[in-house]
Amino acid sequence: MIDPLENGLFDIPDYEQIEDETFPPLPPPLSPGRAELEDDLFGNAEGEEEGEVSKLAEVPVAKRRTVKRPRPKLDANRLISEKGLPALRTLFEDVKFKGKGHETENLKLLMLKMENWAHRLYPKMQFEEFIDKVENLGGKKEVQTCLKRIRLDMPITHEDYVAEEAEIQVPEESVPSGDGGFPEDPFIHSTPAPASLTEEQQQRIELNKRLALERRLAKQKQLESTPISIQEDADEPSTSSSGQFLSEENPKTTSNQTPLKHKPAELQESPLHDNESSSHIANGIIDDDDDDDD
């Protein structure tokens, strides 16, 4: 058998007698003192420059600006906004409730619409909590004023004021002319509704126009009827005074005319009475002035 050591097949150097070279442990990554350790270990000039730079005062880094978005609160101002109580006026316009025997379904539909309205107004609150909060806000002065304006059909939102301006600009041609009517102004004309308005808003504007026209006609009739009553009241004292004046004059005239109309029975039987009745002169008496003229 061939000895491998003799032929040098496995001529491997003997490292058992050689000591291992010791190396210092590596510093942790991205440690603040890494540059100083490198200077001490390797003594490079570049390391010295980096060490000097690291010793300089650190430049303050600009802090990232955070935009704070305040969380909306459910208060009186939010409750009387366009999405709040004024939105309830048109909330059930497209809802059709069923007849008798479907009260449960109608109630569910009503509560569903109210819950939808509450979620749009304040999404971060449950419906039960929302109801309690609205009940507490109901005593606020702003909320009470808003409810009164809704009951009196007064303008609240911007759309209501636009509709009110459209009512004022109703054409005068549609109103019948009269003595007690309003003065006609040729410069007042109706402006067409803007194209951005929805069909529902246009219907509301038309309805407000009709209501304004009806109120205007009623006021015109009232103005036409009031001058007549005032004139009648003013004429009553004059007629009474004139009647009293005539009644005071009548006794004098009647007293003067009684001798002519009612003659004594002795004169009626005399022949002179017959000549007076057949004469063409009134009362059968000839004035002396007429005789002189003849």
Curated annotation (Swiss-Prot):
Region (Disordered): 20-54, 168-203, 218-294
Biased composition (Basic and acidic residues): 263-277
InterPro entries listed in its UniProt record: Csm3, TIPIN/Csm3/Swi3
GO biological process, one term: mitotic intra-S DNA damage checkpoint signaling
GO MF: DNA binding
Interaction with TIMELESS: region residues: 74-150
Record-level GO cellular component terms: chromatin; cytoplasm; nucleus; replication fork protection complex
Composition bias, Polar residues: 237-259
Bias kind Acidic residues: ranges: 37-51
Pfam families to which the protein is assigned, alphabetical: Swi3 (PF07962)
Compartment list: Cytoplasm; Nucleus
Domain of life where this protein originates: Eukaryota
Main subcellular location of this protein, as a coarse class: cytoplasm
The entry's keywords: Cell cycle, Cell division, Cytoplasm, DNA damage, Mitosis, Nucleus
Matches recorded under PANTHER family: TIMELESS INTERACTING-RELATED, TIMELESS-INTERACTING PROTEIN
Subunit note: Interacts with TIMELESS, which impairs TIMELESS self-association.
Stated family: Belongs to the CSM3 family.
Function text: Plays an important role in the control of DNA replication and the maintenance of replication fork stability. Important for cell survival after DNA damage or replication stress. May be required for the replication checkpoint induced by hydroxyurea or ultraviolet light.
Protein name: TIMELESS-interacting protein
Gene name, Swiss-Prot/TrEMBL: tipin
